[in-house]
């Protein structure tokens, strides 16, 4: 009996395959106590798959992309998928080189880049930040650049560049630092002068005059850039080289009125002796400043934009590796007057002013931002996620809930600066302020009534009898769009206004207000004849007829006498 059970178990194990056998091998010791023989799994049974990667390991970013983008359909089975994921993760995080803190920093950095808005993600990823601090610096610089477009009328690429000190440059992989230098030399068709290259490698500060002499013996370079271009700058990533190839436009470097601009000097700050003005002990302060110790390694004009031999700069410029920044300012001009030095930023600005790429599939209305489209779609779906805790009323937008809550709190945050009257909503304040601006009032030619320009066309409909808003259900017409919306609730049966006391619901807010007076006992309408008060205006009108009838009766009796 036992032998037959053992044979059956062995047969089922053979059907399950070596994967299950390997998992059971972990429990080999308990199995021996139970009298079961351990089964050794041959390595060949796991398959002969090996990672199909080249001998030279790819860079961590490539491995990360392969790790995130791997699909189960691309591999032969679960074993291969798991093995490949482990290998890609190891090549990405490099546990044999990085500490636990560094690995955690990489994971946090990846998640930080993931949650960034799409328009920022591309910029930050192009700079390949090595830490979260570098990524934050890029985001802040880009935000400052975008915020400053209206005041400065110019966006410069340095606002979006990652600052690399000599220490950070040394921490870069040799392949990456060499690639940055080789890319710069390849794009410019030039090489570093030997005298300067050795001193740059040794982190020595080169006198300004020597830089100018090495780069331009005739001294025309200083004349061409007097007061216009920076001499010391940040070492930017190779993103600029790629952008120049794509757009053909140089990216000007200019960083002003920002923390990164400390120690950022231009040729206009260079005196005749070739030193920086404001430095007490020649270059001692520069040596102590990590920000100022970064000489520009690569900033070049695209080949199409370089001056010819006959131009002022001369042919020597093409063969020299400049330690100064040279850029031709060719801003993109927008209709609003803002200038942009990069086509991507110009495209973003153009979308904000013109394009509405997000379109509603129900009504065809377009929006500039995706969030506005989501907010609009709640009109069609009827979703009202924001509810008032006082009365239970729900709203589709948080701003509408905020306005509604002021009816409970009595808050009136909007104040008229001329008369001091306060209002709950900004629209009410704007309507009130029109009473102070008499110049915007117009007189109706039909009846002589004076009204604001915003209400003039609405008032003229009273005389013309125009009713442009028509109900498709019953073909009833209305003068105002709001009246049509209120009327629609009769057909849909919608009653959005509910009483917080008794739960009764109404299709109009005015009806709810009248109903609530039953619970509060409020009687706002007062008869001027006898002082009696009423909850509704219709009740007051009915009551006033009593006094009118008494007057008429008294008049008839006097005439008879």
Curated annotation (Swiss-Prot):
The keyword rRNA processing does not apply. It is found in: Nucleus. The keyword Lipid biosynthesis does not apply. PROSITE patterns: KRAB, SCAN_BOX, ZINC_FINGER_C2H2_1, ZINC_FINGER_C2H2_2. A zinc finger (C2H2-type) spans 358-380, 386-408, 414-436, 442-463, 469-491, 497-519, 525-547. There is a cross-link at residues 40, 203, 228, 254, 282, 443 (Glycyl lysine isopeptide (Lys-Gly) (interchain with G-Cter in SUMO2)). It holds the Pfam family zf-C2H2. One of its GO terms (cellular component) is nucleus. It comes from the Eukaryota. The modification Phosphoserine is found at residue 12. Residues 43-62, 238-283 are annotated as: Disordered. Keywords: DNA-binding, Isopeptide bond, Metal-binding, Nucleus, Phosphoprotein, Repeat, Transcription, Transcription regulation, Ubl conjugation, Zinc, Zinc-finger. Residues 155-230 form the KRAB domain. May be involved in transcriptional regulation. This is Zinc finger protein 394. The gene is ZNF394.
């Amino acid at each position: 009996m036992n032998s037959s059970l053992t044979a059956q178990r062995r047969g089922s194990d053979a059907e399950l395959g070596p994967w299950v056998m390997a998992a059971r091998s972990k429990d080999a010791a308990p199995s021996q106590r139970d009298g079961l023989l351990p089964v050794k799994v041959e390595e060949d049974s796991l398959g002969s798959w090996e990672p199909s990667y080249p001998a030279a390991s790819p860079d961590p970013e490539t491995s990360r992309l392969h790790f995130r983008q791997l699909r189960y359909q691309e591999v032969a089975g679960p074993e291969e998928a798991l093995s490949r994921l482990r290998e890609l993760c190891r090549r990405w995080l490099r546990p044999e080189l990085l500490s636990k803190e560094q690995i955690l920093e990489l994971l946090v950095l990846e998640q930080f880049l993931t949650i960034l808005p799409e328009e920022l993600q591309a910029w930050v990823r192009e700079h390949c930040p090595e830490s979260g601090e570098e990524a934050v610096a890029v985001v802040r610089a880009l935000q400052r650049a975008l915020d400053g477009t209206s005041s400065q009328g110019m966006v410069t690429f340095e606002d979006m560049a990652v600052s690399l000190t000599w220490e950070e440059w040394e921490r870069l992989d040799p392949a990456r630092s060499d690639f940055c230098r080789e890319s710069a030399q390849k794009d410019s068709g030039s090489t570093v002068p030997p005298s300067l290259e050795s001193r740059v490698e040794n982190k020595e500060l080169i006198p300004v005059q020597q830089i100018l002499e090495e780069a331009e013996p005739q001294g025309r370079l200083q004349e061409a850039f007097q007061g216009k271009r920076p001499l010391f700058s940040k070492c930017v990533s190779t993103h600029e080289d790629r952008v120049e190839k794509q757009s053909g436009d140089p990216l000007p470097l200019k960083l002003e009125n920002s923390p990164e601009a400390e120690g950022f000097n231009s040729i206009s700050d260079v005196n005749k002796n070739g030193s920086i003005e404001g430095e007490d002990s020649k270059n001692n302060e520069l040596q102590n400043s990590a920000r100022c110790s970064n000489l520009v390694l690569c900033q070049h004009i695209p080949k199409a934009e370089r001056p010819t031999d006959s131009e002022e700069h001369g042919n020597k410029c093409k063969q020299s590796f400049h330690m100064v920044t040279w850029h031709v300012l060719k801003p993109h001009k927008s209709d609003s007057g803002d200038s942009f030095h990069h086509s991507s930023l110009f495209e973003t600005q153009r979308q904000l002013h013109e394009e509405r790429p997000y379109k509603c599939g129900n009504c065809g209305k377009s929006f500039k931002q995706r969030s506005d489209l989501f907010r609009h779609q709640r009109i069609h779906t009827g979703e009202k996620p924001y509810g008032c805790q006082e009365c239970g009323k729900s709203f589709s937008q948080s701003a509408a809930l905020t306005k509604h809550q002021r009816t409970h709190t009595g808050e009136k945050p909007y104040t008229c600066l001329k008369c001091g009257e306060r209002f709950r909503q900004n629209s009410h304040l704007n309507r009130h302020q029109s009473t102070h601006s008499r110049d915007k009032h117009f007189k109706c030619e039909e009846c002589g009534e004076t009204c604001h320009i915003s209400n003039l066309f609405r008032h003229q409909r009273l005389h013309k009898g125009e009713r442009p808003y028509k109900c498709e259900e019953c073909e009833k017409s209305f003068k105002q769009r709001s009246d049509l919306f209120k009327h629609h609730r009769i057909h849909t049966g919608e009653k959005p206004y509910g009483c917080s006391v008794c739960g009764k619901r109404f299709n109009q807010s005015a009806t709810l207000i009248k109903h609530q007076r039953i619970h509060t006992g409020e009687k706002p309408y007062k008869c001027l004849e006898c002082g009696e008060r009423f909850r509704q205006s219709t009740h007051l009108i009915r009551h006033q007829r009593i006094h009118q009838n008494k007057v008429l009766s008294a008049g008839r009796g006097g005439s008879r006498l």
